[in-house]
């Protein structure tokens, strides 16, 4: 004990990062478990498919899918509208040295990713989906306004503004599509901007319709969120192990984690007096415990006090986190 007390907190964080995680089967096969006993039996996973909302006559997943499939998403492919006589002007600028990826190829890749990503965002949460729909719509509206204000030779379209990757998950952000070619500019005088504007206006109309149709799905009417509340309630009121009220929630997107934290923390505190924390790796974490540092190590220590040696790392602290929300 005296030796452990001499170590700085950084030592334990380092050990947590380099320690090899062994599976149950590995431990049962190579280690003597007579002292610790058998691992608890795992319950079968639950596969739930809640409705989008409990509102009558509201939009459903099929309606949203149909609208998404109607989107052209030409906001991500402006190079397709460069006039043939002007293509040579942009050839050297849009063909990235050292790769076979052209600007047109990159744009088409991002367009396809965004088409798939809209479905991913919807699967994650209606909140994340709404954010992405509104961001794309704002981007399209701004581009249409640029075209409307266009005067011959006086306007340049900066493609940096339409290659934002904040709506994509971590795996998609690591593709070459987001690592090369973010500096290309196209003069609107070199584009068939009339055709492009026509396609943009179609998408803007459909996105506005989508935004209006999901606007009424507040947390109170978000069936997926309410289903999560029911699962948490059952876990706390009928724990598998006596006194075990721990809940770990993973999501692919940090803004879904924010949405869950805002609602789950309030629900857990008001109904059961439990503390909640959020760790996404993007920004400093959050916790309902006043004055507690919300860094990863402190949050994990308060969430799993026995395994993390909380009595040594945070002596005298009685604070404990029961619900932890994080990104994959």
Label every model-predicted segment.
Residues 220, 265-328:
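Conserved RecA-like P-loop NTPase helicase motor core
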Residues 1-162:
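Inter-lobe coupling linker of SF2 helicases/translocases
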Residues 219-252:
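Conserved interdomain hinge at the start of the Helicase C-terminal
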């Amino acid at each position: 004990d005296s030796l452990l007390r001499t170590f700085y907190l950084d030592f334990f964080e380092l050990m947590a990062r380099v320690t090899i995680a062994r599976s149950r089967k590995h431990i049962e096969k190579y280690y003597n478990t007579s002292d610790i006993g058998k691992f608890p039996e795992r319950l079968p996973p639950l596969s739930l498919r809640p409705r989008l909302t409990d509102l009558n006559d509201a939009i459903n997943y099929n309606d949203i899918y149909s609208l998404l499939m109607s989107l052209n998403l030409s906001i991500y492919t402006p190079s397709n509208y460069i006039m043939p006589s002007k293509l040579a002007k942009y050839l050297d600028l849009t063909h990235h040295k050292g790769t076979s990826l052209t600007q047109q190829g990159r744009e088409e890749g991002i367009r396809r990713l965004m088409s798939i990503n809209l479905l991913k965002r919807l699967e994650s949460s209606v909140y994340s989906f709404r954010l992405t729909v509104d961001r794309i719509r704002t981007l399209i509206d701004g581009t249409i306004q640029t075209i409307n204000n266009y005067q011959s030779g006086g306007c340049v379209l900066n493609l940096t503004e339409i290659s934002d990757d904040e709506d994509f998950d971590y795996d998609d952000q690591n593709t070459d599509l987001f690592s090369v070619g973010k500096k290309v500019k196209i003069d609107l005088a070199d584009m068939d901007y009339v055709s492009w504007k026509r396609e943009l206006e179609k998408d803007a109309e459909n996105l506005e319709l989508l935004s209006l149709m999901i606007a009424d799905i507040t947390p109170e009417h978000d069936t997926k969120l309410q289903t999560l509340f029911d699962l948490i309630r059952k876990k706390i009121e009928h724990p598998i192990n006596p006194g075990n009220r721990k809940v770990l929630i993973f999501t692919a997107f940090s803004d879904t984690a924010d949405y869950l934290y805002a609602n789950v923390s309030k629900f857990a505190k008001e109904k059961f007096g439990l503390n909640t924390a959020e760790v996404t790796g993007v920004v400093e974490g959050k916790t309902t415990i006043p004055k507690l540092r919300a860094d990863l190590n402190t949050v994990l220590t308060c969430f799993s006090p026995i395994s993390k040696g909380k009595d040594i790392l945070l002596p005298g602290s009685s604070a404990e986190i029961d619900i932890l929300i994080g990104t994959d």
